[in-house]
Amino acid sequence: MPTIETRTEPMVINMGPQHPSMHGVLRLMVTLDGENVVDCEPVIGYLHRGMEKIAESRSNIMFVPYVSRWDYAAGMFNEAITVNAPERLADIKVPKRASYIRVIMLELNRIANHLLWLGPFLADVGAQTPFFYIFREREMIYDLFEAVSGMRFINNNYFRMGGVAADLTYGWVSKCLDFCDYFLPKVDEYERLITNNPIFIRRLDGVGTISREDAINWGLSGPMLRGSGVKWDLRRVDHYECYDDFDWEVQWETKGDCLARYYLRIREMRESVKIIKQALEHLPGGPYENLEAKRMMEGRKSEWNSFEYQFLGKKLAPTFKIPEGELYARVETGKGELGIYLIGDENVFPWRWKIRAPDFNNLQVLPQLLKGMKVADIVAILGSIDVIMGSVDR
């Protein structure tokens, strides 16, 4: 009796750009052989808005409100690098109090970023309940942002060259300390709900593994790099702001799979709380930005077009010119290395403003991770990368 043979041909399907697990307008052209992934091609660009070109036709103070739309889960980091690059090129000193306030805001935003990653990621792999608990704590962080800047999610417009836009409001420090004391037990609660769940572990353990060498060669950064055994954190490497004033540890894992990246981000939230509490308890006095004291000391001798008038004499004059030169500045966001390559030519507008987005680089490794995996693993691997398409497409 002849046997019946089943012949299969590769099938190309499109996931996105409207798929609920795509984390934005990302399109994946996936080639399947049955349930197995043969190839994957990410298609990007649906959210491109020309942010680099916009930056080259705006002064710094005009451009800061735009930058929340790169990575809209990490608006404070976008603002930080937007002011850090011209500050370093012009050698502008930031007061100690302003630097502490910046660190507090950045670490709060890091926690909010990880929470926004954790909730949808767990929902993608089938754990629906923790999503609501996680977003409850995330809203509390946005309450703190609203109290100090007037805005919650994006458009905080809080960072300025030389400092921050406004000092911390009355009672804000105690509210933030209360949040830190409240939040740490909640992280333990997330772990009780998720970490030892056998279904969760089977979905992630050994899935989407990246070796140490591949992570370095692909130019990965953030949890994608540290989860593969590379102890690299720009807060330690570049010593920017005042991170050296605090006692904290760089978190890293060696296994390089989705589960390792989950463990890493959970521990990073605890380290961020540790940094915030230290910054609040040792918050120095003094100005929160460079003000007009130096110019006022000169009296009537001060020149209207001097550096002191254009920068120190005002919060930031629209006529402040970016000095001639080039510089690459970078910060460690919740996703990795966010960098700006800046070229100034003694003009109000930058001559070149190149954005190095962390999730754009991290996304490039996705086809390698998906080959040979199952269809059900696609959303788990993509979710573990933590991609925001506003940052990828810019």
Swiss-Prot record:
Quaternary structure note: NDH-1 can be composed of about 15 different subunits; different subcomplexes with different compositions have been identified which probably have different functions.
Superkingdom, natural source: Bacteria
Xref: SUPFAM superfamilies: HydB/Nqo4-like (SSF56762)
Listed Gene3D superfamilies: Cytochrome-c3 Hydrogenase, chain B
EC number: 7.1.1.-
Biological process per Gene Ontology, one example term: photosynthesis, light reaction
Alphabetical UniProt keywords: Membrane, NAD, NADP, Plastoquinone, Quinone, Thylakoid, Translocase, Transport
Bilayer topology term: Peripheral membrane protein
InterPro entries the UniProt entry points to: NADH_Q_OxRdtase_suD (IPR001135), NADH_UbQ_OxRdtase_49kDa_CS (IPR014029), NDH1_su_D/H (IPR022885), NiFe-Hase_large (IPR029014)
Record's function text: NDH-1 shuttles electrons from an unknown electron donor, via FMN and iron-sulfur (Fe-S) centers, to quinones in the respiratory and/or the photosynthetic chain. The immediate electron acceptor for the enzyme in this species is believed to be plastoquinone. Couples the redox reaction to proton translocation, and thus conserves the redox energy in a proton gradient. Cyanobacterial NDH-1 also plays a role in inorganic carbon-concentration.
Reaction it catalyzes: a plastoquinone + NADH + (n+1) H(+)(in) = a plastoquinol + NAD(+) + n H(+)(out); a plastoquinone + NADPH + (n+1) H(+)(in) = a plastoquinol + NADP(+) + n H(+)(out)
Family as reported in the entry's similarity comment: Belongs to the complex I 49 kDa subunit family.
Gene Ontology CC, one term: plasma membrane-derived thylakoid membrane
Localization annotation: Cellular thylakoid membrane
Name the UniProt record assigns to this protein: NAD(P)H-quinone oxidoreductase subunit H
Enzyme class: translocase
MF (Gene Ontology): NAD binding; oxidoreductase activity, acting on NAD(P)H, quinone or similar compound as acceptor; quinone binding
Classification via Pfam families: Complex1_49kDa
PROSITE patterns for this protein: COMPLEX1_49K
